[in-house]
Curated annotation (Swiss-Prot):
<keyword id="KW-0547">Nucleotide-binding</keyword>
<feature type="short sequence motif" description="'HIGH' region">
    <location>
        <begin position="44"/>
        <end position="52"/>
    </location>
</feature>
<dbReference type="GO" id="GO:0006430">
    <property type="term" value="P:lysyl-tRNA aminoacylation"/>
</dbReference>
<keyword id="KW-0067">ATP-binding</keyword>
<dbReference type="InterPro" id="IPR014729">
    <property type="entry name" value="Rossmann-like_a/b/a_fold"/>
</dbReference>
<keyword id="KW-0963">Cytoplasm</keyword>
<dbReference type="GO" id="GO:0005524">
    <property type="term" value="F:ATP binding"/>
</dbReference>
<comment type="similarity">
    <text>Belongs to the class-I aminoacyl-tRNA synthetase family.</text>
</comment>
<keyword id="KW-0030">Aminoacyl-tRNA synthetase</keyword>
<keyword id="KW-0648">Protein biosynthesis</keyword>
<dbReference type="GO" id="GO:0005737">
    <property type="term" value="C:cytoplasm"/>
</dbReference>
<feature type="short sequence motif" description="'KMSKS' region">
    <location>
        <begin position="290"/>
        <end position="294"/>
    </location>
</feature>
<dbReference type="InterPro" id="IPR020751">
    <property type="entry name" value="aa-tRNA-synth_I_codon-bd_sub2"/>
</dbReference>
<dbReference type="GO" id="GO:0000049">
    <property type="term" value="F:tRNA binding"/>
</dbReference>
<dbReference type="InterPro" id="IPR008925">
    <property type="entry name" value="aa_tRNA-synth_I_cd-bd_sf"/>
</dbReference>
<feature type="binding site">
    <location>
        <position position="293"/>
    </location>
    <ligand>
        <name>ATP</name>
    </ligand>
</feature>
<keyword id="KW-0436">Ligase</keyword>
Amino acid sequence: MSKIWEDAIKSNAWPFVEAKKILDSLNGQIPEKGYVLFETGYGPSGLPHIGTFGENARMVMVQKAFEQLSDIPTKLICFSDDMDGLRKVPSNIPNPEMVAQYMDMPLTSIPDTFGECESYGHYMNAKLRSFLDKFGFEYEFYSSTNCYKAGMFDEMLRMVLEKYDEIMELMLPTFREERKATYSPFMPICPKTGKVLQVPIEKWDAKAGTVTYKDKAGNYIEVPVTGGHCKLQWKPDFGMRWAALKVDYEMYGKDHLANARLYSEICRILGGKPPVQLCYELFLDENGEKISKSKGNSISIDDWLKYAPVESMALFMYQNPTRAKRLFFDVIPKNVDEYITFNQKYHLEEDRAKRFANPVYHIHHGNVPKIETFGITYSLLLNLTSVCNPSDKSVLWGFISKYEPKATPNTNPYLDHLAEFAIRYYNDFIKAHKSYLSPSEKHKVILQDILDMLSDIADQTEAEAIQKAIYDIGMKAGYENLRDYFKDLYQILLGQNEGPRLGTFIKLYGVQEMKKLVEGQL
């Protein structure tokens, strides 16, 4: 065994922990199909949200960790449940009243309200795929509609008929009495309307491969369960898919946890082996409510990428997948700065085991680019933007170039992008909410002390020395809690409750510019 393998197998980073579970489930052997199958799922009822991206990003982290532990080939599929009937019209799409006419129709049988693709489902699938492609995921896209209609699931659907009673015995105890009377694992597709029907099944014939139901007129309608003429209810569908595709690893949100036992048991009933599974916590919006594609109450993928690099979004996905996290615009600056810190630590670290534990290893699948920001963080750029209110990033670069003459937009493209992102974020989220504190007489004494200190120091004074001098002024002012002191300074000088380390900020902004800012409040 190589030292690299030993470090990876011992790692406590969660992608390696998951990868070890998969390897153990296989007893180190290559599956009969010749590869290990990772599956992610997507419900295209509404526009893909950031949670959809998150599942795929996390899945690839586990896939790449597995490839570090084993030379067994792997494959990732993204499965779209686009044959589901439309149950609710999303609020964040154009022409919702048009879509409302197609309730219970398969998503791939509804006209595209965006006017770009052959159906609503195809449009939603395209939105997901375009981003997965943009991020560089290597995957195969599976459409539920195509799988059912092409006969990929036919063998399993016939087996569901053969095991009908056993599956019903498993499912019925999970329902209320009213639902028990009408439930069947099969949902016929109406030959006349094309709708996905949730109707009682009057008769099922395993030999003929058909089910029979009553239409609204009381007529008995017999349809094959194969060839896309029926679809399974979502719980049996989950387990059937695991068995049909021989899935080895699946992730799902906490909303699936209560049904995970059913998925696994149905997979076993159909002769399959349930995959290793990871249940991740759901993202919450600013109000602590679950984010939803149909509500559109979340940051979209495009929203995040308007204000920050994609790596920061991947870091948010990596961190603590089994813990619920609030997902709103305020988390963006923090994740950008944490990514910068992790990136710098990774390249300073020589211990491979510690590198394996660093999130950026998994975000970049072991090929971590080296970025240089010269100690300039996203938060620092936001505060610089706050005081100089630039029309474009060239204004920020004027300060950056004085702070670090080596830095240029061409040689430091990451920093250049951060400057552009910071201006956008400031204009959209900070500018309108700035509220300045009018300085009291006590504050004016403090500001004068700061001004005197700035007048006495040279432009070459180190940031730490400036920070200590400001700290000493706060101590002298008699604050019981220096947090209150710095909060007052941020409110007076920046119009915000929070702010940067002032020593570093003054070095970036410039001593003379800072003197003008302080003088303006006296």
